[in-house]
A protein has these predicted regions:
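Multi-pass membrane proteins that catalyze or facilitate reactions on polyprenyl-/lipid-phosphate substrates
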Residues: 1-36, 210-298
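Hydrophobic alpha-helical transmembrane segments of integral membrane proteins
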Residues: 96-124, 183-198
């Protein structure tokens, strides 16, 4: 691969990209408070239509339609697409961004599921949190919706990739945005009408997916060139990185949906992710200080 200039964002571009993350994060925080305080419970209860009992034939249909929210489908597809973009752009950024965003999103989602312990509408009529009456964690963990965070994270990655494409592919950005919006809407409606999640679970999930994905993207854009450029990264690092990414794709494709959401794995992943971010940020600060010293000396 020939050396190619690595994409870097200006401070203004980073602020512009961070704005949707702040908005989405604020929406998620507001819904979280409303759910914990029980303010959203009456609304959630009223919006349960119970179609799976009144019209049983709809359950199978909505189960198929909510497939974009299934991690085993959307995550491997996003990872494979990131590999294609990495090869075409001669930059590891697409794959690093996709993997870090999906992992971080999944881990944060799992932590909030474990922290809130909210029951699913299909299994209980009580939308309250901190419900310890269930003996099985599989009956809890409704907030936020994993279906919503999954499709929101993948859609955000697709939209970011579309708008950062080469000029000749830029006209595809609008159709891709429309398609992802439709996929999100179908997932929302299907999960709601199938009683997979409370409505606030779904809205919070979409907000969290957008927020965590953009945060991971901004972090990935700060990585040094030797982490992003295939030639500078070196063959051993490329091999280890490729094996790790393919292993994650296999886990997401074949593991049960509760693999990360209902176990301590989520907490470990968040800790590891934040630790890695802190380590890279510390190195980045050290490099910046060293550059300033060199500039001052010269």
């Amino acid at each position: 691969m020939q050396l190619r200039k690595i994409l870097r964002l200006t401070d203004e571009e980073r602020r512009l990209l961070a704005r949707p993350a702040f908005i989405a994060g604020g929406i998620f925080a507001a819904i979280l408070v409303a759910v914990i305080l029980g303010i959203a419970n009456p609304l959630d209860t009223v919006l349960v239509l119970d179609l799976r009992h009144s019209h049983p034939w709809t359950d199978g249909m909505f189960k198929i339609l909510e497939s974009p929210g299934q991690r085993r489908f959307v995550y491997p597809l996003a990872i494979v697409l990131s590999f294609v973009l990495t090869y075409r752009r001669r930059d590891l950024l697409p794959t690093i961004t996709a993997v870090s965003a999906l992992l971080f999103t999944n881990a944060v989602t799992g932590v909030f599921k474990l922290a809130t312990l909210r029951g699913f509408p299909r299994r209980t009529g009580d939308p309250g949190v901190f419900n310890t009456d269930f003996g099985d964690l599989a009956d809890l963990g409704a907030f936020p919706s994993g279906h919503a965070t999954n499709v929101a994270a993948a859609s955000t990655l697709l939209v970011l990739a579309a708008y950062s494409a080469r000029p000749k592919f830029r006209p595809l950005a609008t159709p891709i945005t429309v398609i992802t919006a439709i996929a999100c809407f179908i997932t929302f409606v299907s999960s709601w009408l199938r009683d997979t999640h409370w409505v606030t679970d779904l809205v919070a999930g979409f907000a969290l997916g957008v927020c965590t994905t953009i945060v991971a993207t901004l972090w990935a854009l700060h990585l040094p060139d030797h982490w992003r450029h295939p030639e500078l990264a070196g063959r051993p690092r490329i091999i280890i990185f490729t094996v790790g990414v393919l292993s994650l794709a296999a886990i997401f494709m074949f593991a049960a949906n509760s693999f990360l959401s209902h176990s301590g794995t989520s907490i470990l992943m968040v800790g590891a992710t934040l630790g890695f971010i802190a380590r890279q940020s510390h190195k980045g600060i050290q490099r910046a200080v060293a550059r300033n010293r060199d500039d001052s000396a010269s």
